[in-house]
Amino acid sequence: MKFIIARKVGMTRLWKDEKVVPVTVLKAGPCVVVQKKTVEKDGYNAIQLGFEEVNEKKLTKPMLGVFKKANVKPMRVLKEFRVENVDQYSVGQEITVAIFQEGDKIDITGWTKGRGYSGAMKRWNFQGGPKAHGAKFHRELGSVGQHTEPARIFKGKRMPGRYGNERVTILNSEVVTIDAQNNLLAVKGGVPGARGSLVIIRSAVKQ
């Protein structure tokens, strides 16, 4: 199982095998192993990775203690990854984008763009009302339920509300190219989230 933490840089296109391939560029790593979790002590096997160095003044004293115990520099992002054998890793070990190869299949988890409180037409692609003269509703929701029976709105009814900022995983994305010197990874297709947003990269589970 390969994994790393990254940030979305943006999209571009590459020329490969006489075809234009749309790719998303990710700045992946370098990450540092901050902590190891074991079945005996914590009930499960996992390692905790740190990403992006940060000034000590921006962290609380308990968080600083975690990094001082591991003897590593303070990190902005901490994420846990389940592993079968924690003995393969050591605290302070650096994990870079070089662990991946061109053609690898990976799963990418990100958070979609937050669009705030949105109406039913934008959030659920509702048709809306008539646009002609005389109509008193154009972008409204419409009927949401009956009056006398059942005299309530059913759970799950699609209505206006907060739209976006949801955790989404893209399965089986293909690694197109790697720039290990600059910690860059180019994957085929799109990746959820805005430019600069955080993404989690793992080896594909369903291949």
Swiss-Prot record:
GO molecular function, one term: structural constituent of ribosome
GO BP terms: translation
Highest taxon of source: Bacteria
InterPro entries: Ribosomal_uL3, Ribosomal_uL3_bac/org-type, Ribosomal_uL3_CS, Transl_B-barrel_sf
Alphabetic keyword roster: Ribonucleoprotein, Ribosomal protein, RNA-binding, rRNA-binding
Alphabetized Gene3D superfamilies for the sequence: 3.30.160.810, Translation factors
Transmembrane segments: none
GO CC field: cytosolic large ribosomal subunit
Pfam families in the record: Ribosomal_L3
NCBIfam families on file: L3_bact
UniProt similarity note: Belongs to the universal ribosomal protein uL3 family.
PANTHER family: 50S RIBOSOMAL PROTEIN L3, LARGE RIBOSOMAL SUBUNIT PROTEIN UL3C
SUBUNIT field: Part of the 50S ribosomal subunit. Forms a cluster with proteins L14 and L19.
Cross-referenced HAMAP family: Ribosomal_uL3_B (MF_01325_B)
Main function: One of the primary rRNA binding proteins, it binds directly near the 3'-end of the 23S rRNA, where it nucleates assembly of the 50S subunit.
Name under which the protein is recorded: Large ribosomal subunit protein uL3
Species the sequence originates in: Fervidobacterium nodosum (strain ATCC 35602 / DSM 5306 / Rt17-B1)
